[in-house]
Amino acid sequence: GLELVGLTGRRGRVVGLPGQEWDMIAIVRYRTRANFIEMIEDEEYQRVMKYRNGSLENSRLIECVINKPEDYPSPLDIGEPTERLIGNAHANGDERMKSFRDRDAEQPIFMLNLIRCKAETDPGVGLDGMDGGAGYQAYGDAMERDYHEDVGMSVPWKFYPCATIIGPQDEQWDQAFLVSYPSRKAFRNMVTDSSYRTGNQLLRDASVLDSRLIETTPAIR
């Protein structure tokens, strides 16, 4: 009963770690966890896994649910990530953004966001006393108010990760979602806007412990 609900081709890592370059991002829906477990324990699946393993240099498998868990953000005490990235893409100087500017400015894109929230927000930006999940929600509300309509952005898929099944165990995420932008130009104009960098981004940085931002485009099959 699995269903491929999203498939994108990787174009660039805007916020990420060296060596984390991806060729494909697939969103696969299973009816239940039991269905997934039954599949991976099946002898035929185990037999064909050699083709998968022989083809991949690196991968992640992240279990997610659609509804927000009661214990959101995750209370798992796995320690802080070995290497963490809050989200400053240095829009006017970073090599990643220079490569971003070299690609077709008018092409529609998706941005995959992986977010791990802080236990408590940083003070000084109007989010004092909140947990990181509530702070990030305030950031999301501000983005919807200030940019969604003007930029033409939307969030077609949003999930709540439960666990990293394949990947470093210190990569623990609280949110995973895709944001659709009408063009690379629209995204860059937003993140370089002075109001975003001196307002909205401060809310994000105060709430986020670790993050990834991966530029993707719809895959043609």
Give the ranges of each region predicted by the language model.
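Flexible, disordered linker segments and immediate boundary regions flanking tandem C2H2 zinc-finger modules
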Residues: 49-53, 200-203
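Short S/T/G/P-rich N-terminal loop/turn motif that feeds into the first structured element of a domain
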Residues: 1-25, 31-46, 55-178, 182-198, ...
